[in-house]
Curated annotation (Swiss-Prot):
GO terms for molecular function: flavin adenine dinucleotide binding; NADPH binding; thymidylate synthase (FAD) activity; thymidylate synthase activity. It catalyses: dUMP + (6R)-5,10-methylene-5,6,7,8-tetrahydrofolate + NADPH + H(+) = dTMP + (6S)-5,6,7,8-tetrahydrofolate + NADP(+). Belongs to the thymidylate synthase ThyX family. FAD binds at T73, R96, H97, R98, E104, N205, L206, H207, H211. The gene is thyX. This is Flavin-dependent thymidylate synthase. Homotetramer. Binds 4 FAD per tetramer. Each FAD binding site is formed by three monomers. It comes from Rickettsia bellii (strain RML369-C). The active site is at R216. It is an enzyme of class 2 (transferase).
């Protein structure tokens, strides 16, 4: 059989195709398929104004320009499909990005495996006192974290035990008690804790993937989703290195500055002393600007 293809092939991505990349304790990411590379972005962009240039440094410059000026369509020419195993509570956060095609493992048709996520002790922390949606950076004392882990593990194991008891089947689907009918899988699943693992296929174009990564690979993102995003960044780097470099330069390591912020910077450059009180900015805006300028 001749397996030759006329498609664009990225050797670095071919090396990891179908291979599970471990994330968290039981999770993974696998690249299942992809379409296009950096050249596909350039090709789509040049349709707008003719054949143009072909040298690699000029391709790189064009990609930098496109990303810097927020062009979107050329980056939509590349697609990638992942197979991802992740905790249910992270999947619910992830699915809020409504720009991908998703097909998830169904607990109506199948029995969920007995695998659940337990955080590392250093990742167990109290609620942030300044941010309603995240934890403090300092973890709980080791002995307290161990108690938390014991509760999480005990609850998860008990819930799975009751899950199989409600269905009257074990993890493999074998009947437990011939005298017991059990209830439907679609009902029994409601008893499982959110740290149990689910799986899905997730297909997305590069433009929307970069938006996802800008938010979820950010230091402020929840740790458990951020580690998935960081692995995906490595995949993007292997797949479209020019785009990755531009993305890192203009999005991940760049900054958006407001009109007032720009005025403050101009005053500072001219030697004028500017304080929060004289800046005309809110406290949070001022803190964000000073953080950028540090």
């Amino acid at each position: 059989m001749n397996n030759a293809t006329k498609r664009v092939v990225v050797p670095a991505l071919e090396e990891i195709l179908y291979e599970p990349i471990k994330v968290l304790d039981h999770g993974f990411i696998r690249v299942i398929d992809y379409m296009g590379d950096d050249s596909a972005i350039v090709q789509a962009a040049r349709v707008s104004y003719g054949k143009g240039t072909k040298q690699l440094n000029q391709d790189k410059g064009l990609i930098n320009y496109l990303l810097r000026h927020y062009h979107t369509t050329p980056f939509e020419m590349c697609d990638i499909k992942f197979h991802i195993k992740l905790p249910i509570f992270i999947a619910r956060q992830w699915i809020r990005h409504r720009t991908a095609s998703v097909n998830e493992y169904s607990a109506r048709y199948s029995i969920l495996g007995n695998e659940f996520y337990l955080p590392e002790p250093q990742n167990i922390a109290p609620q942030s006192s300044t941010n309603k949606q995240c934890r403090e950076s300092d973890s709980l004392p080791k002995e307290v974290a161990e108690k938390v882990l014991n509760i999480l593990e005990e609850d998860a194991r008990n819930c799975y035990k009751h899950y199989t008891k409600l269905m009257n089947t074990d993890e493999e689907g074998n009947i437990i008690d011939d005298n017991n009918t059990g209830i439907a899988r679609e009902l029994a699943r409601m008893n499982l804790t959110l740290n149990y693992y689910t799986e899905w296929y997730w297909k997305i174009n590069l433009h929307n993937l970069l938006h996802f990564l800008r938010l979820r690979a950010d230091p402020h993102a929840q740790y458990e989703i951020r580690v998935y995003a960081e692995k995906m960044l490595d995949i993007v780097k292997a797949w479209v290195p020019f785009t990755y470099e531009a993305f890192e330069e203009y999005r991940m390591c760049g900054a958006n500055i407001s009109r007032k912020g720009l005025e403050v910077i101009k005053k500072m450059i001219s030697g004028e002393k500017v304080t929060h009180e004289t800046s005309g900015m809110t406290k949070r805006e001022w803190e964000e600007l000073t953080k950028i300028l540090k």
